[in-house]
Amino acid sequence: MLHTKIVDSKDKKLSINDAERFITSVEFGASIFFTGTVRNLNNNKSVVGITYDSHDELVIKSFEEIYKEADKKLNIQDKAVFIEHAKGYLNLGEMSIIIAVACKHRDQAYVLSRYIIEEIKKRSPIWKKEYYTDNQSDWLKGNPIVHEKI
């Protein structure tokens, strides 16, 4: 069971309650919630906010691929996974991503949650622009839309 979505920050905030409603089931004995939030310091620069941009269709496709790969690589068939990522400007402390997983056992839930966030960071086409207290801003290194074959 999978739910994926890119959420425009102008329209809605990410919600732990939405994630909990989606993954809750008597079939599962373990739930893990991961949230990423905008922090105030990165690379010794004082951050005031971040704009997230993405290629929405390819991001959703990458989330779906990661979910399917988890079946093969982790051998966790019975699971519920909720992934939402924000798009647009976020202030300090606001959530940029929610990953919620439910599995039969806690060890499965921990492994699955970690696998999902690490794979998203490696390959989903999501980019962020940080804004700093000195009125400067920088686009940070992100993932390309097409990965080069070596």
Positions of the model-derived regions?
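N-terminal, polar/charged subdomain of small-to-medium soluble alpha/beta proteins
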Residues: M1-M95, R106, Y110-R114, E118-I150
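Short hydrophobic/aromatic beta-strand micro-patches
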Residues: A100-A102
